[in-house]
């Protein structure tokens, strides 16, 4: 479980001012007041959408505001209501008061729509102030102000795909290449110190959440390194992507068996999760084709399985990739999406 969050202020719109005007037409030289009311300010709504997966759209925002109401018009015409501000969020989003930490809304269900802040009421036009004593009032009301609140959105996310690999195998490079996550990347172990989530957009209508966790080392299940702290974060992912380094001095077989062993010791259920294998750093590998062929033969793995005849004891695919050169990344995204759709 990961927490995505964003903090900013939201405001409803101010009401439009009423109009002070008088009826002026041919043959009506002394017409009475006809100023219309101002339009109400726009409201603020939260809307839950299953096709939204993260709070990325709200990162970096400082303030969001609904539109103000339009001023009233002559001829008793009411100004237009200000456009509403609709905040689209994924299911599972909680809205907190950023100042008091009070839970304000718990947004769970697809299509759920909640009014959060009401717009200010529009001011009255001068037509309302005509009396027997004052037949030509020039008074009109200003609109009432909108409401403002400092909020914090929190989303507890379960990633669809969890990356499993040794430190420095290229997990951070991969997730930064194919998703909207921008983790720290450097050529040393444990660059990733906290889990990172990224939304991978496969096409206009499809995507999934990928999680990058600190690298697993041999003995991680016994508490060595940083991996044990974060293996729990991928316990609820739907698919595991094992990342094995083609340019490493250790054989592909040794790397894979060690990773599998650590995951198995940590959680037998996690080890049974649907999985695929990415053979990384293709651009830096020597004799890559021979290594890949040997690896496939040793385990009797296919390069890619048929989703309708999927043997879950084996990887759905074994794909060489280079995050730096971009090789295999499109196939990787579509392959992972295919497994996830098969799960659903």
UniProtKB/Swiss-Prot annotation:
Residues 1-12 have a biased composition (Polar residues). Residues 1-158 form the Obg domain. Residues 1-36 are annotated as: Disordered. Its EC number is 3.6.5.-. GO terms for molecular function: GTP binding; GTPase activity; magnesium ion binding. It is found in: Cytoplasm. An essential GTPase which binds GTP, GDP and possibly (p)ppGpp with moderate affinity, with high nucleotide exchange rates and a fairly low GTP hydrolysis rate. Plays a role in control of the cell cycle, stress response, ribosome biogenesis and in those bacteria that undergo differentiation, in morphogenesis control. Belongs to the TRAFAC class OBG-HflX-like GTPase superfamily. OBG GTPase family. Monomer. This is GTPase Obg. The lineage of its organism: Bacteria, Pseudomonadati, Campylobacterota, Epsilonproteobacteria, Campylobacterales. The gene is obg.
């Amino acid at each position: 479980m990961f927490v995505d969050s964003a903090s900013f202020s939201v405001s409803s719109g101010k009401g439009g001012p009423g109009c002070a005007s008088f009826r002026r037409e041919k043959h009506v030289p002394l017409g009475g007041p006809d100023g219309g009311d101002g339009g109400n300010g726009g409201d603020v709504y939260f809307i839950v959408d299953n096709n939204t997966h993260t709070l990325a759209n709200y990162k970096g925002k400082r303030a969001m505001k609904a539109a103000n109401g339009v001023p009233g018009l002559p001829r008793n015409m009411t100004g237009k209501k200000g456009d509403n501000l609709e905040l689209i969020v994924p299911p599972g989003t909680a809205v907190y008061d950023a100042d008091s930490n009070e839970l304000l809304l718990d947004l769970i269900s697809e299509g759920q729509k909640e009014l959060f802040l009401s717009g200010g009421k529009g001011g009255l036009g001068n037509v309302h102030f005509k009396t027997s004593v004052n037949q030509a009032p020039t008074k009109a009301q200003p609109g009432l102000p909108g409401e403002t609140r400092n909020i914090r959105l929190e989303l507890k996310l379960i990633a669809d795909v969890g990356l499993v690999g040794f430190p420095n195998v290229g997990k951070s490079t991969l997730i930064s290449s194919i998703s909207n996550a921008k983790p720290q990347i450097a050529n040393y172990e444990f660059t990733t110190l906290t889990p990172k989530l990224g939304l991978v957009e496969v096409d206009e209508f499809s995507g999934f959440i990928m999680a990058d966790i600190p690298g697993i080392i041999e003995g991680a299940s016994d508490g060595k390194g940083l991996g044990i702290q974060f293996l729990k974060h991928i316990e609820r992912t739907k698919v595991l992507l094992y990342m094995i380094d083609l340019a490493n001095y250790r054989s592909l077989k040794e790397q894979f068996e060690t990773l599998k062993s650590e995951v198995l010791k940590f959680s037998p259920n996690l080890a049974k999760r649907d999985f695929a294998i990415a053979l990384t750093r293709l651009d830096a590998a020597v004799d890559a084709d021979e290594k890949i062929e040997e690896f496939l033969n040793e385990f009797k793995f296919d390069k890619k399985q048929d989703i309708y005849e999927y043997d879950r004891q084996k990887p759905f695919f074994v794909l060489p990739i280079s995050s730096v050169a971009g090789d295999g990344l499109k196939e990787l995204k579509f392959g992972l999406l295919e497994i996830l759709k098969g799960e659903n």
